[in-house]
């Protein structure tokens, strides 16, 4: 059954435009409350990032949940993975995050976690969607839910993050830059690393409601790289607006993406006997990651793009490490979802145990040049079914001879075909991508 409101990561859009309006979000809170109230504790946690619209949407959700008879526990600015963790520890029915992740301040979204800290099952999302088709019907006055604010949520999550780093190790002597993207980790991440012994230079920690992800954070890592070089730091780490993804920078200013972070974490787990199974990446994962893991004898599998699909495949295979090149890293031995701070701590653990700088740890993986070309096509057409396109793809794959990949996929949000080619030689890859793109254009 097709979804009307929920995407792969909740409900998202531009603030003030449907569905991110106060009236719809209030109804969403009520609908979620109706579905969740059939269970036990009738408590729901609400966290948000630092967007100015978060105040408005938090109040709307609170009103809707109260009308359905549920208690709203407000945590204020809190990373997405913190909401997932605290939902479990509070024994709540669900956790709700108000965030649009790495998007600009004028976007926002609502996403849900179930009682065990994982994404809501499809059947629960569909039940909420079904309730949205009904008029709001408030419970009796005596049954209305209350709202309370907890003041120690950040401290609880800081202690959890620190607990994922071995107690016999210390970050003493390490100088690092931490860029919080003016987002939800601003009052948490610097404290985690400082309390573990690191010297921390913090940037992107002055949110004003409008500057989230604005020239800082994991989607703008040049600011981090520049600060690492300026301060002669050992490394840097940057988070996105809601703290579920990261990128890192070594002491030379080289930007380390999610694929390289996966490699570092997996190799360290193998070296220390903690690796269970293999690693899950996505269709967009660099082939350099696959070959580097292959050299170590570590199995690698590709899921569809999206952390939801990565997690699904990890659970299917029983593997504990997975993620995306965008920096969503899932370490199931520690968390139930992507967690930027926890993933950074796994890399820092590898630095400590191997007694190597970050630049040395990532040197075992060489990324292949990867070229992406977007081709717009007319609605109703299917260029991917054209014989000429498939013949050109087959020809390119033959030329790559197993030392590269071709991926064609439709955008999920606009009429675009994304042509991705990767291989060992950049100019060759560019030429191949253009050849395929021309055939796609000719197909309609």
Curated annotation (Swiss-Prot):
Keyword Oxidoreductase: no
Class of this enzyme: isomerase
Residues at which Mg(2+) binds: 101, 240, 242, 244
CDD domains: GlmM (cd05802)
Reactions catalysed according to its record: alpha-D-glucosamine 1-phosphate = D-glucosamine 6-phosphate
GO MF annotation terms: magnesium ion binding; phosphoglucosamine mutase activity; phosphomannomutase activity
Top-rank taxon, per record: Bacteria
Active-site residues, as the UniProt record annotates them: 101 (phosphoserine intermediate)
Cofactor note: Binds 1 Mg(2+) ion per subunit.
Any one of the GO CC terms: cytosol
Residues modified as Phosphoserine: 101
SUPFAM superfamilies linked to this entry: Phosphoglucomutase, C-terminal domain, Phosphoglucomutase, first 3 domains
EC number of the protein: 5.4.2.10
Annotated Pfam families: PGM_PMM_I, PGM_PMM_II, PGM_PMM_III, PGM_PMM_IV
Keywords assigned: Isomerase, Magnesium, Metal-binding, Phosphoprotein
InterPro entries: A-D-PHexomutase_a/b/a-I (IPR005844), A-D-PHexomutase_a/b/a-I/II/III (IPR016055), A-D-PHexomutase_a/b/a-II (IPR005845), A-D-PHexomutase_a/b/a-III (IPR005846), A-D-PHexomutase_C (IPR005843), A-D-PHexomutase_C_sf (IPR036900), A-D-PHexomutase_CS (IPR016066), Alpha-D-phosphohexomutase_SF (IPR005841)
Protein family (similarity comment): Belongs to the phosphohexose mutase family.
Its biological purpose: Catalyzes the conversion of glucosamine-6-phosphate to glucosamine-1-phosphate.
Annotated protein name in UniProt: Phosphoglucosamine mutase
Organism classification: Bacteria, Pseudomonadati, Pseudomonadota, Gammaproteobacteria, Aeromonadales
């Amino acid at each position: 059954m097709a979804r009307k409101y929920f995407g792969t990561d909740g409900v998202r859009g531009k603030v003030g435009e449907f569905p991110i309006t106060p009236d719809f979000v209030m109804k969403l809170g009520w609908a979620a409350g109706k579905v969740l109230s059939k269970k036990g504790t009738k408590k729901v946690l609400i966290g948000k990032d630092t967007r100015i619209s978060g105040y408005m949407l938090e109040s709307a959700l609170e009103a809707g949940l109260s009308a359905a008879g549920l208690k709203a526990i407000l945590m204020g600015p809190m990373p997405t993975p913190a909401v997932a963790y605290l939902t479990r520890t509070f024994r709540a029915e669900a956790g709700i995050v108000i965030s649009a992740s790495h998007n600009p301040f004028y976007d926002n979204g609502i996403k849900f976690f179930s009682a065990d800290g994982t994404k809501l099952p499809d059947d629960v999302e569909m039940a909420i969607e079904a309730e949205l088709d009904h008029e709001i019907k408030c419970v009796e006055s005596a049954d209305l839910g209350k709202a309370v604010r907890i003041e120690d949520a950040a401290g609880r999550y800081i202690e959890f993050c620190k607990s994922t780093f071995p107690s016999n190790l210390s970050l003493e002597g390490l100088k690092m830059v931490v860029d919080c993207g003016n987002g939800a980790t601003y009052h948490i991440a610097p404290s985690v690393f400082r309390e573990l012994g690191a010297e921390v230079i913090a940037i992107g920690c002055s949110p004003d409601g409008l500057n989230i992800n604005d020239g800082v954070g994991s989607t703008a890592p040049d600011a981090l790289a520049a600060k690492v070089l300026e301060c002669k730091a050992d490394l840097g780490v940057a988070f996105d607006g809601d703290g579920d993804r990261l990128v890192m920078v070594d002491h030379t200013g080289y930007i380390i993406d999610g694929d390289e972070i996966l490699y570092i974490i997996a190799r360290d787990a193998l070296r220390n006997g903690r690796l269970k199974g293999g690693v899950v990446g996505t269709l967009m994962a660099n082939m350099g990651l696959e070959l580097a893991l292959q050299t170590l004898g570590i199995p690698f599998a590709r899921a569809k793009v999206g952390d939801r699909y990565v997690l699904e495949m990890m659970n299917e295979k029983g593997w504990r490490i997975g993620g995306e090149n965008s920096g969503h890293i899932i370490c199931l031995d520690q968390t139930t979802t992507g967690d930027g701070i926890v993933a950074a701590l796994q890399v820092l653990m590898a630095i400590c145990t191997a007694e190597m700088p970050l630049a040395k740890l990532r040197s075992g993986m060489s990324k292949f040049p990867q070229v992406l070309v977007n081709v717009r096509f007319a609605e109703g057409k299917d260029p991917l079914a054209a014989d000429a396109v498939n013949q050109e793809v087959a020809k390119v794959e033959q030329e790559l001879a197993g030392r590269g990949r071709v991926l064609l996929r439709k955008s999920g949000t606009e009429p675009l075909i994304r042509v991705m080619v990767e291989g060992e030689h950049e100019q060759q890859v560019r030429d191949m991508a253009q050849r395929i793109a021309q055939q796609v254009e000719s197909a309609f």
